Amino acid sequence: MSYLIYVINGPNLNLLGQREPELYGGKTLRDVEKSCIETAKKYNAKLKFFQSNAEHDLIDWIHASREEANGVIINPAAFSHTSVAILDALTLFEGPIIEVHISNIHTRENFRHHSYVSQKATAVIAGFGTEGYNIAIRKMTDLCGQLKTS
């Protein structure tokens, strides 16, 4: 069985590799996407990637996921801590959701410790660097498989 997974990235992630590499690493978003594609092939999954610095774009992609995606992997970035609108959009999605953060948001500034998205996420992966995306893909295919067999 093949699964379609939306991978949604929020603000400033288009600058991976340039923005605070000591915190986020040296890989670009395109590098991350290439690595994810390789992982997805091993697990018979297809990916659709989205990135925007605009909250409304992320919401539109979450809405679109309802029509075709088996699961959503989302790194809402700074919107994690501020966006009830993204939480509300995710609440409408009926499949599994994995929230990914490159850094461990719980060891950073206090305002980053709370994520609205976590309230709806099936799982949260944080602090593994960009490898967190590949972990999320592996776990998402497990979750999608469990839903199909139950």
Language-model regions: role of each:
Residues 16-30:
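Glycine- and acidic-residue-enriched helix-capping/strand-helix junction motifs
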Residues 65-72:
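Short acidic/histidine-rich motifs immediately flanking catalytic phosphotransfer sites
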Residues 92-108:
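Short, acidic/small-residue loops that bind anionic groups at enzyme active sites
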